[in-house]
């Protein structure tokens, strides 16, 4: 993908809330290369974002997104998606792990960017300890390659120590969060269908996954149940 598609800007350095005012489809590619830090009593962990997905909900322009949690109505679960832009939406996925989203669009309009994958840039030992703690006992002693510590949304949330109870609805511009834009625009961005999303929402009609090509931390593409067939868009 060439720079300029999907409204990619040259915003670098520190972010402010206006960065998240556009909808998720505009913001998702701009987050590639940004660095997110999450502090805790154990210490901070930072991750450089290498893969994102956009989800569009109530009040947004464009096609109806059947893959979005906020596609039909506001609920207790998705309430954070309707907050001011620049807040965290953390949910529990498949009864197994947490996933982190950044809230976009003006208040009351629901869109969010799923932070799918990243590369840990500091706090590696703490991220590793958290990942190993979450592993089943039979795998606990097997080493985890550093490039895989935050590969996939569940692993990323675990490495950063995120939970719904502690982090859902928090402001990304206040502790324990800190976020900084990429120091320079990416040389290239790839796009394709979203990973593991069922039905038409996981097909080529919704090429709303964005990633940095050549990054080993990026997920391998896996189609969702009953998703329309498309050429694999695994990271290259």
Where are these regions (language model features)?
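Conserved, well-structured core segments that form or line functional sites
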Residues: 2-236
């Amino acid at each position: 993908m060439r720079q300029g598609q999907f409204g990619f800007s040259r915003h670098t350095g520190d972010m402010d809330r206006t960065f998240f005012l556009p909808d998720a489809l505009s913001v998702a590619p701009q987050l590639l290369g940004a660095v997110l830090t999450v502090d805790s009593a154990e210490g901070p962990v930072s991750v450089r974002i290498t893969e994102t997905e956009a989800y569009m909900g109530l009040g947004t322009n464009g096609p109806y997104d059947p893959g979005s949690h906020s596609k039909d109505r506001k609920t207790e679960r998705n309430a954070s998606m309707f907050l001011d832009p620049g807040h965290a939406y953390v949910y529990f996925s498949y009864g197994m792990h947490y996933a982190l989203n950044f809230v976009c669009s003006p208040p009351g309009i629901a869109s969010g960017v799923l932070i799918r994958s990243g590369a840990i840039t500091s706090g590696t030992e703490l991220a590793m300890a958290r990942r190993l703690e979450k592993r089943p006992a039979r795998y606990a002693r097997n080493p985890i390659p550093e490039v895989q510590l935050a590969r996939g949304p569940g692993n990323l949330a675990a490495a950063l120590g995120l939970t719904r109870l502690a982090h859902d609805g928090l402001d990304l511009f206040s502790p324990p969060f800190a976020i900084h834009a990429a120091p320079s625009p990416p040389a290239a961005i790839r796009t394709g269908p979203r990973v593991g999303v069922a039905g038409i929402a996981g097909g080529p009609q919704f090429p709303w996954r964005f990633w940095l090509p050549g990054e080993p931390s990026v997920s391998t593409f896996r189609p969702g149940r009953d998703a329309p067939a498309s050429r694999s868009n695994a990271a290259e």
